Amino acid sequence: MQRLTIRDFLKKKGKEKITMLTVYDYSMAKILSETEVDGFLVGDSLGMNVLGFPSTLQVTMDHMIHHTRAVVRASPRQLIVVDMPFMSYEPSNEVAVKNAGILASEGADAVKLEGGVEVYERVANIVKFGVPVMGHIGLTPQRYLTLGGYRTVKDEAKLISDALALEEAGAFSIVIENVYAEIAKKITEKVSIPTICIGAGPHCDGQVLVIHDLLGMGDIQPYFSRKYLDLKAEIREAVKRYINDVKTGTFPGRENYKSRES
């Protein structure tokens, strides 16, 4: 099965909605690789959803490398984009290029950076050295402290300026997070590269959701997500039945073990 490419994403602009899911591990990526979803984002949100950190700020390159390897091994078809974690690109162009190259060598088809005008040089240098970049504007979780928390971003002029700067720097796509739908629509119309929304309305070229939110596995259900399954409840019920079967002696059943008499 042929993996989707950057060119495939670009061709979908304004024609076919792009679907992406944030995924972190081999077993989940293996299941999802058998669907028609277009791309996987190995997100630094693994800090909260997998590692139990309070935010994305504690996530390191080692964490991202580990989870990138797992997802890559499971995914023959989907385009794989990997978040560059906090302080893996901010210090200098050289640091940014080096770390982007490491993620690419582990199988990432592209990397994602948070920020707009302020990361122009980082994006341009990473692209120049051969690693595709997806931008990320609006609510940028790595900068939530300076934003005063996880708030809807309303500065239309800055958002448009950020999007245009990312496109000029060579980004092939832009994630727009937690922005008014009308602003996301304007950005989508102004740039020639695909926009991917999360909490920014229906007018982008595509959507991305965290698989934990889609399956109802998280502690908090974000307003912008849709829970397609209450997997947390189903897991609890399955474990409850297992415990009951063990205590009542109905597990293991005769079909679950071997004996000399069989």
UniProtKB/Swiss-Prot annotation:
The gene is panB. The lineage of its organism: Archaea, Thermoproteota, Thermoprotei, Sulfolobales, Sulfolobaceae. CDD domains: KPHMT-like. Mg(2+) binds at D44, D83, E114. Catalyzes the reversible reaction in which hydroxymethyl group from 5,10-methylenetetrahydrofolate is transferred onto alpha-ketoisovalerate to form ketopantoate. One of its GO terms (biological process) is pantothenate biosynthetic process. It comes from the Archaea. Belongs to the PanB family. Its EC number is 2.1.2.11. This is 3-methyl-2-oxobutanoate hydroxymethyltransferase. It comes from Metallosphaera sedula (strain ATCC 51363 / DSM 5348 / JCM 9185 / NBRC 15509 / TH2).
